[in-house]
């Protein structure tokens, strides 16, 4: 098969068709291909970020702070919202198609008959691509779990675990302790581990101790607390005072900030920001798809919350901005998510539900969501075929409502961002 003239989309479509297991946790395949490529990780600071929720926010905070200090920073996150290129950035700019294509060609030249999943291809390509840039630091987001995730072929300078909650039980275990054990698999011997997961700090700390690793736990070794003139971040040896926390943040974002700052101290304390530069950063800090607000006739509030823990945090942020009046929600979930728990967090502030089937085989159907909503006594529900139909429908009735909430998955928030941007 001649792939010399393939565009990026051709490569991605082909990768999806090769291995039908979208999730197939194992390090054997990526390690074998990594060895065949002769890949050697760069001698720079590498931050590896795992957790149930808050990984993306923590990565963005770390990236913003390190770039502010003048470092050249590469990041790898997943999934993307609009374009695949978002997954890999260098100094805040997504890489060009050619960067990925060159890396995919390099992988194919050595892969042989070793099967790779879509995510494994992307991870190897991300590392190859970033290695071509003069990076001072990499910030890498774990995809799923940790121990067997493709990103775990790296040996990080600091391992970060943001929080632990129930999600992806089919692959990671049915209890928070089982999930914590999987995520703690990223802890590297003799490299510090920073943990923002207070509920499983003991078990993660035990694993860190067995690996002869310095362990920093939120609440014990570092914290973000209220002070006289703002918030105060403190560790055993450093303090940053007068921090102005954004008024729409919830506890999750505050914990992510505390964890990011401790991670920087654990890696290189000289890179910690002062309060003035940190406040300037926070005043301008935003992440696509995380409490992202568009003003299109009425406010559209978008959040990729896709499990109960994330939904609780999203609800807290809505309360922080004192959301009131009649609100409408565009909503869909994957089949493995706890729909009833998710819905219970929003039903008292939602006057109308608009549901649809997302463009992925893992999506619940709109009809199934509607059926389960009616079983909970929620009957003002409109079912539409796909996200775009839902957005167009909302456009015709939004004058009756105070705000539009869009949530449940990257697969509905991403298309909504694209749709709203096209309306500008």
What are these regions (language model features)?
Residues 195-197, 209-227, 247-251, 273-284, ...:
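Beta-strand->loop->alpha-helix junctions that form or flank phosphate-binding loops
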Residues 122-171, 202-243:
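Extended acidic/charged loop-beta regions that coordinate divalent cations
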Residues 133-142, 149-160, 164-168, 175-178, ...:
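Nucleotide phosphate-binding/pyrophosphate-handling subdomain across enzymes
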Residues 7, 21-23, 27, 31-35, ...:
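ATP-dependent carboxylate-amine ligase catalytic core
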Residues 1-21:
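Charged, amphipathic alpha-helical linker segments immediately N-terminal to NTP-binding catalytic cores
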Residues 49, 57-74:
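A conserved segment at the C-terminal end of the G1
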Residues 194, 198-203, 210-215, 299-300, ...:
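C-terminal helical cap/extension that packs against the catalytic core
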């Amino acid at each position: 098969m001649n792939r010399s003239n393939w565009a990026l989309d051709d490569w991605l479509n082909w990768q999806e068709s090769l291995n039908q297991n979208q999730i197939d946790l194992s390090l054997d395949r990526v390690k074998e291909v990594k060895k065949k490529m002769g890949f050697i990780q760069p001698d720079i600071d590498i931050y590896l970020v795992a957790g149930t929720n808050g990984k993306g926010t923590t990565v963005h905070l770390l990236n913003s702070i390190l770039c502010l200090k003048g470092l050249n920073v590469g990041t790898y996150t997943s999934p993307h919202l609009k374009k695949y290129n978002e997954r890999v950035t260098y100094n805040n700019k997504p890489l060009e198609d050619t960067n990925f294509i060159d890396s995919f060609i390099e992988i194919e030249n050595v892969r042989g008959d070793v099967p790779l999943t879509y995510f494994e291809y992307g991870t190897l390509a991300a590392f190859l691509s970033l290695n071509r840039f003069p990076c001072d630091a990499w910030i890498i987001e774990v995809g799923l779990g940790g121990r067997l995730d493709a990103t775990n072929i790296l040996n990080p300078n600091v391992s970060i675990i943001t929080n632990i909650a129930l999600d992806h039980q089919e692959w990671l275990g049915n209890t928070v302790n089982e999930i914590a054990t999987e995520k703690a698999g990223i802890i590297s011997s003799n490299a510090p581990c920073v943990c923002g997961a207070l509920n499983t700090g003991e078990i993660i700390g035990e694993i860190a101790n067995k690996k002869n690793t310095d362990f920093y736990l939120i609440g014990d070794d570092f914290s973000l607390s209220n002070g006289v003139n703002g918030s105060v971040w403190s560790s055993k040896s450093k303090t940053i005072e007068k921090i102005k926390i954004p008024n729409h943040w919830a506890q999750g974002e505050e914990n992510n900030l505390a964890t990011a700052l401790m991670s920087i101290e654990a890696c290189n304390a000289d890179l910690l920001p002062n309060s003035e530069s940190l406040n300037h950063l926070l005043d301008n800090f935003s992440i696509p798809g995380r409490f992202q607000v568009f003003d299109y006739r009425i406010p559209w509030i978008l959040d990729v919350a896709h499990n109960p823990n994330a939904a609780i945090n999203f609800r807290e942020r809505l309360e922080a901005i004192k959301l009131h009046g009649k609100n409408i929600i565009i909503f869909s979930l994957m089949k493995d998510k706890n729909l009833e728990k998710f819905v219970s967090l929003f039903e008292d502030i939602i006057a109308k539900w608009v549901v649809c089937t997302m463009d992925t085989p893992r999506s619940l159907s709109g009809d199934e969501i509607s059926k389960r909503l009616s079983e909970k006594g929620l009957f003002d529900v409109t079912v539409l075929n796909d996200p775009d139909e839902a957005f167009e429908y909302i456009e015709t009735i939004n004058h009756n409502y105070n705000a539009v909430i869009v949530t449940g998955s990257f697969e509905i928030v991403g298309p909504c961002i694209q749709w709203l941007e096209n309306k500008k």
